[in-house]
């Protein structure tokens, strides 16, 4: 599982997240949880070190 570097959309702090092989990040948002638009997408809730919750939608 490769590690991907993300940035918190609220404070910009670095966040590391493991994604399945071949996965591509489609969106990173703090606004609202976006549901997957296909069977090959998932949405994960992530927190940065400043306790900001945000959502990562990815596809594989």
UniProtKB/Swiss-Prot annotation:
Decide whether keyword Signal is in the record: no
Care to name a GO molecular-function term for this sequence?
zinc ion binding
Residue ranges covered by zinc fingers (C4-type): 8-52
* Pfam families hit by this protein: Zn_ribbon_Brz
Q: Please provide the record's keywords in A-Z order.
A: Activator, Metal-binding, Transcription, Transcription regulation, Zinc, Zinc-finger
Identify the InterPro entries for this entry: Brz_Regulator
Q: What does the UniProt entry report for the null mutant?
A: Mutants show various up-regulated and down-regulated genes, including bop and crtB1.
For the keyword DNA repair, the answer is no
What is known about what this protein does?
Answer: Activates transcription of bacteriorhodopsin (bop) and phytoene synthase (crtB1). May interact with DNA or RNA via the zinc finger motif.
**What does the similarity note say?**
Belongs to the Brz family.
- What this protein is called in its record is Transcriptional regulator Brz
């Amino acid at each position: 599982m490769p590690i991907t570097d993300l940035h918190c959309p609220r404070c910009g702090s670095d966040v590391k997240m493991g994604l399945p092989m071949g996965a591509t990040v489609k969106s990173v948002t703090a606004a609202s949880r976006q549901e997957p638009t296909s069977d090959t997408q998932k949405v994960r809730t992530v927190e940065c070190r400043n306790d900001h919750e945000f959502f990562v939608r990815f596809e594989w």
